């Protein structure tokens, strides 16, 4: 009784693939602070005098994987309610929540520039990807129409398509990823509407470039460039100017309904940050918490090898 009649590779360890997302989500939701939203904040460390912010502006990333174009606009609308139109200082992105490794352990380098493998950062804008839509012309042989979302001057587009022209070659989306460039190349024969997501290098710079671009669009005079630095929270002058919150439920829905790799990694990073209370969190900090839950459930963590939060690892 209770004995197997036949086994085949019963002891073989298999890749979890996207079922890994279940372990990550369950562990994250088991924590007391599980319902804390994913936050993106803007702070300054100076004073506002005569229409000028005398000090630095900081955008503090909380690894919100659902921060999109609308979120960016809403954050900026809050910032411009403050009585200044000139920033006499620097604009910084604070990505100190996480270490600098932008891919998970065992992720395939040649999966880039696929949208399902973005460059991970506490500052994510539109999932670190651009959605490209290609529509054939009404005239055979004409160049197809290409549109991209979100709009940003951070990337460029090269359109080498032909409408319903077989000798134009196989249709393809790509990016000059071998040189970490952000020129999106769309080429080949377009016989019908095509859509795809392409990742952008690199995510925090994509975020900050677009943030400055849209601030200027609202009439704010900003520095020409941005940098990366940690918010000096112990300074008496620091003040929060704006905050965007994304609910855990929204992040979870995208994770479980759409099997979103980015959302799983965001949960893993936040899990590590909540458990350790430290900065520069590594994936291993979150994985340790998953292993602890496995033990609490009566299993031996030594029977499992966990490499990331989403199951993309090879």
Where are these regions (language model features)?
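A short, well-structured edge-of-sheet supersecondary motif
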Residues: 1-8, 227-228
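Preference for short coil/turn "hinge" residues that link or interrupt alpha-helices
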Residues: 7, 13-16, 100, 116, ...
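Short active-site loop at a secondary-structure junction
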Residues: 7-27, 31
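Gly/Ser/Thr-rich beta-alpha loop segments that engage phosphate groups in nucleotides
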Residues: 19, 190, 313
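Conserved serine DD-peptidase/penicillin-binding transpeptidase domain
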Residues: 31-302
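Extended C-terminal subregions enriched in glycine
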Residues: 298-314
């Amino acid at each position: 009784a209770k004995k197997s009649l036949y086994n085949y590779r019963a002891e073989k360890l298999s890749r979890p693939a996207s079922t890994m997302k279940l372990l990550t989500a369950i562990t994250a939701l088991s924590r007391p602070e599980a319902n804390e939203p994913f936050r993106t904040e803007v702070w300054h460390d100076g004073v506002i005098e005569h229409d000028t912010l005398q000090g630095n502006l900081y955008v503090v990333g909380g690894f919100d994987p659902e921060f999109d174009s609308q979120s960016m606009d809403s954050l900026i609308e809050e910032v411009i309610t403050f009585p200044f139109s000139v920033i006499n200082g620097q604009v910084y992105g604070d990505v100190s929540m996480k270490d600098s490794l932008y891919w998970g352990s065992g992720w395939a380098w040649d999966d880039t520039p696929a949208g399902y493998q973005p460059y991970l950062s506490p500052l994510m804008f539109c999932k670190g990807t651009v959605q490209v839509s290609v529509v054939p012309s009404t005239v055979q042989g004409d160049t197809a129409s290409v549109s991209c979302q979100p709009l940003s001057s951070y990337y460029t587009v090269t359109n080498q398509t032909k409408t319903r022209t077989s000798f134009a070659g196989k249709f393809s989306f790509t990016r000059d990823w071998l040189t970490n460039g952000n020129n999106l190349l769309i080429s080949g024969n377009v016989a019908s509407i095509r859509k795809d997501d392409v990742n952008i290098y690199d995510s925090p710079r994509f975020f900050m470039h677009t943030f400055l671009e849209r601030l200027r669009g609202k009439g704010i005079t900003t520095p020409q460039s941005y940098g990366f630095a940690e918010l000096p929270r112990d300074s008496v002058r620091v003040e929060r100017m704006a905050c965007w919150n994304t609910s855990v439920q929204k992040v979870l829905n995208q994770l479980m309904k759409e099997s979103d790799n980015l959302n799983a990694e965001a949960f893993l990073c936040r899990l590590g940050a909540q458990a350790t209370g430290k900065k520069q969190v590594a994936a291993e900090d979150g994985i340790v918490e998953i292993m602890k839950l496995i033990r609490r459930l009566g299993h031996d963590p030594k029977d499992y090898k966990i490499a990331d939060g989403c199951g993309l690892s090879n």
